[in-house]
């Protein structure tokens, strides 16, 4: 993984962490692009059960910086409330009611999607908060496209 490439990497945490803490836990030289906040798995610490994780993408500005996570969160919860998948889902409805009015900084984050140069992910190796990681798309770094992080 630590060759001259860029990658997207999904990280699952050992427990939920507030967004404000997640921001401090992650290296500054990777891009935080998606927050995993809910799944139908009762005890996430036991590992994936094949259920889909629910979360939302973070909007980025022209400098690849997160610029309006509150709006992103609000749109996510509005979409969940309208989803037929959540209409009869008691646990899902409970999650919505407990979290939709929280500020992003206080949301329980179970995992994240990150992008960046593969060498920058090395800082996450052996971190106790990382329960698991999954490498998604990778691409070689080429001279005519410079990664921002």
Language-model segments: which ranges?
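Short, surface-exposed ligand-recognition loops at beta-strand->loop->(often short) alpha-helix junctions
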Residues: 11-18
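General structural signal for secondary-structure boundaries
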Residues: 18-20, 117
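Glycine-rich loops and low-complexity Gly/Arg-rich segments
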Residues: 34-39, 137-141
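Extracytoplasmic/luminal low-complexity segments enriched in Pro/Gly and acidic/polar residues
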Residues: 89-149
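Extracytoplasmic
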Residues: 4-8, 30-35, 107-111, 130
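Short amphipathic alpha-helices in soluble, non-transmembrane regions
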Residues: 22-30, 123-130
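Charged, low-complexity helical/coil segments in non-catalytic cytosolic or luminal regions
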Residues: 26, 36-99
